[in-house]
Structures are given as structure tokens and as C-alpha cells.
A protein has these predicted regions:
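Short, mixed-charge low-complexity intrinsically disordered segments
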Residues: 30-54
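N-terminal acidic leader/helix
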Residues: 1-31
Length: 54
């Protein structure tokens, strides 16, 4: 799985080698990456997650 994080004023950040067994992407974003999901907008695609700051 690939995780792409989009910020308004910075280039896209891609985080690779995310385990395929991640069941709850929101928990992964918060607990592992440290981002508050209430401050993000994200969408799941086939093996890809796009995140934007809101």
C-alpha cells in the first residue's frame, strides 16, 4: 500500500512499505504517523490513500 500525504504549501509526501494488513487507515494515520485525523481529509483508493490538510 502507498500513502500519499498532500499539504497545501509543501510537495506531496509519499510513505511507502505500509503493511497490507492495515485494517483501519484512520488509526494508522493517527497512531503510527502522528497526524490528527480531525485535521485531515483523506480518501482511500486501491492500495493508495490520499491525505490533505484541512
Amino acid at each position: 500500500m502507498k500513502l500519499a500525504i498532500m499539504f497545501c504549501n509543501t510537495p506531496e509526501i509519499e510513505i511507502r512499505n505500509i503493511p497490507d494488513n492495515i485494517e483501519d487507515v484512520e488509526v494508522y494515520i493517527h497512531d503510527v504517523l502522528g497526524y490528527k485525523t480531525s485535521e485531515l481529509s483523506w480518501q482511500c483508493y486501491d492500495k493508495q490513500v490520499i491525505i490533505r490538510m484541512i
